[in-house]
Amino acid sequence: MTVDDRTLDTLTGEVVDLLQTLIRNECVNDGTPESGHETRNADVLRTVIEGPSVEVETLKVLPGRDSIVARLPGTDPHAPALMLMGHTDVVPVSPDGWKVDPFGGERIGNEIWGRGAVDMLNVTSSMAVTFRHIASSNRRYPGDIIYFGVADEEAGGGYGAKQLVRDRWDVLECDYVLTEYGGSPVVTNDGISVLLTTAEKGVCAQRIVVSGEPGHGSMPYRTDNAISKAAEIVRRIEDYDPGPRIDKLFESRIKGQGFDAELEAKLLDPGRVVEALAEMEPGLARNLHSCCHTSFSPNLISGGTKHNTIPDRVELTVDIRILPGETVHDAQQHLRDAIGPELMGSTEIEAIHDQTATESSTDSPLWSALTDAIQMTYPGARVLPSMVTGGTDARFFRERGVPSYGAGLLSADISLGEFMNRFHGHNERIDIESLRLTTKLWLDVLDRLWN
């Protein structure tokens, strides 16, 4: 639905107000069942999107952790349905690192500050305002439009999309999904590239149990100390290199970044990519390294019973993110290779998560609609597929064969590196122009999808 500038200004103002409210509701998800309190945001979103032509259903998994879904019926029952999906929870903060109240939702200049401003209450808000605008205008498209405001994305979706896609497909059924994250314009010598998400790495966290022999802490000589062995295992995992994989998705990402020819050549060479990354800005280097490697991060360790007792058991949790095409068995074999046979004799490996990587093809009407819509704002822009190294709720839909893309459209004032650093970081914020462009994107996509 094409709108004039005045209408877009009004909608943007509504997005700003809604975003501020969602931030102030402080729906912090620390991973425990009793956290999140997403019902606060679900109730607000309900008041925004419900109306005479819209029925909103509350989806309950746990008390206080509501999700909501609403469907705007299309005119053609055979036309594909599009879901606009945004999560309503945010991650915890360290207040001492913030310049402002992280849950104040303050407007400072042309930016809205607060936890969730980029992850992803900005998108959740713009989608809700877009959905309400379409419903109130009485404009109908061939296919259904679904709004899904979902809880618990930040802790894996067990109380949100993961369970609801499994148990409530009757209300969530769709043919396409738009969600986080994407839309950063990258200025290159050849013009502008805009990266959208078509894939995400798999999560294969593993628990490593290291065994030893107990003894008195005053006599450590020639003892079998489980902590000492665990420390060596951590060192070996840190040093382990599974080798890079330069696939078409990574190649597309590199060619769209606008690097100079020499750096681009290094990044696309398996023998030189790590050398090239070592010379780059750390934030971008970390992201690109993870996009072409299976990654291993030892993040939790526990063991020992008393200061004077040699420990006989240590548990170590390693966050492993695998590339498309790899399995949990591949992840465990990497660990065995890293640890080595002499230490594997006193080590057990157990899978905690077994989530394979997911990827959607760009050969779809929705991708074409996104490309056309983005080029209305950034004429001639190359719209390129990319992979996120973390997880989103899109994976649960991709597993059902539903093409799912992470989208949005940011202003040129936010670099890709800065945008990535704001996720889960201090002083999270979004500029109002990006809220305007993202809202316009949804409207432009809807005008093009069924054409």
Report the location of each language-model feature.
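Cysteine-centered functional microenvironments
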Residues: C27, S67-V69, E111, G116-A117, ...
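Metal-dependent amide/peptide-bond hydrolase catalytic core
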Residues: M1-V3, T10, A155, G182-I192, ...
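N-terminal helical capping/dimerization or prosegment-like subdomains
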Residues: T2-P95, R313-T317, V328-Q332
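Hydrophobic, small-residue-rich alpha-helical packing segments that form membrane-like cores
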Residues: V123, R140, G149-C204
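Active-site metal-coordination/substrate-binding segment of hydrolases
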Residues: H78-G149, E428
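Short beta-strand segments
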Residues: M85-H87, G149, L178-E180, V209-S211, ...
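Active-site-proximal alpha-helical scaffold in enzymes
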Residues: L121-R139, G158-R166, A226-R236
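Surface-exposed acidic, glycine-flexible loop patches that form ligand/cofactor-binding
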Residues: L8, G74-D76, S136-Y141, W169-D170
